[in-house]
Amino acid sequence: MTEHPREDLAYAIGVQAYIWGYPVVINERRSRIGMASSTDIIPHMLRGPLNTFVSAKELLTPDFEDVQSPNNDTLYTTAWLDLRDEPMVMHVPDMAGRYYTYQFLDAYTNNFTYVSQRTRGFQEMNIAICGPGHSGALPSGLERIDAPTPTVFIIGRLGVDGPDDVPAVHALQDEMFLGPLSGWADRRLAEPRVAEPSGHTGPLAFFEEGLEALRTLPASEARAALEVLGRYLKERLADRGPILLIHHMVHRDNEGSVRRHEALVS
């Protein structure tokens, strides 16, 4: 029998919450890096404002450290989307037989769809990416993709057949378009928006960022299971004051010793 059952339980829950919340928090942090601190587009770093395509103009080398093991035979195009206000529309030009793929990741970093030569062929197309709960009609000629979360990360890759082929890929990148549904008729771009600092510091910043992100996300099966656990704990500990959701957070200092931090969540 442990001497501190409540503390040990809270610690165990904290560890599980950290593991489960890791992709959400890291994705949020990565989005802040990906969205530049100004409205400028920085192609060689694949950074730019929200709801904007940013295209690399040179093949990446090992010096590029924002992504592990980047391709050297494709040019990248990326975008961070916020679909809470309205859908975003992307235009894919006729690829004329060239390899391409657009990878769509939700806020949990799950790949929920691909737009590629395998799934769509090479023809020109226009696609509306809709957030959860959007039920409005779309203009004629728009294919609909429903995103499971209100934030989405797109990673596009266009095949390049050596350095001499780069200008041809630049031309395709210039034909790509991304903008709000409300501006689709006149191809209006989104108003430039940059990432806001998280505002969370200190040893509990990870958990605070995770809770903030989860407030905007629809429930997944894993999250639903955690909510059931949370209700159970609240019932069991209701007569003992605030719930010790994370009583002990463990991290090691430079000497390798363990320090504990208490957080009370009512």
Enumerate the predicted regions with their spans.
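A compositional/structural signature for long, glycine/proline-rich flexible linkers
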Residues: M1-S266
